[in-house]
Amino acid sequence: MRHAFELVLKDGILILKNIQIEYCGSDRNEIYENKEPLEYIEQRGHNLMKLLNEFRNNYNSLELEEDFPKAIEPVLNNLHQADRSSTEFRYGMRADTDPSYIDSASLCKELSEQFDKLENVIDYAYGTVKSRYSTQRQNEPTAQAASS
């Protein structure tokens, strides 16, 4: 599940940046620091908190009515603290360490809820900005006709 969060954050960053380019007139080279999108996102690394911060900053830059959900950060921070290197959950435990015991049912439920929230944030941002842009475009001919 940790890897899924990393991937949805990276995907979300790309989507939010593309929204900025497509609908907000942002410069592609500036947004992606003169890199191709995949090269840019690969260089973001595996740190969940850094990815979350970049995701949230991109979301907030769109100036949407809905605030970024606060409940996501503590869950991602817990995952980050448990697996800073992004390898612990992938490879289990090392032979020389003691195993960790968790309430996996509760953990899975909480992770699933926050994962869904992240996906909803992406959908909300895309839908809202696209709708705002479409409305502006529809109003442009009306404004131009009125000024003629």
Task: Please describe what each predicted stretch is.
Residues 21-148:
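Long, charged low-complexity segments
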Residues 1-16:
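Short, hydrophobic, well-ordered secondary-structure elements
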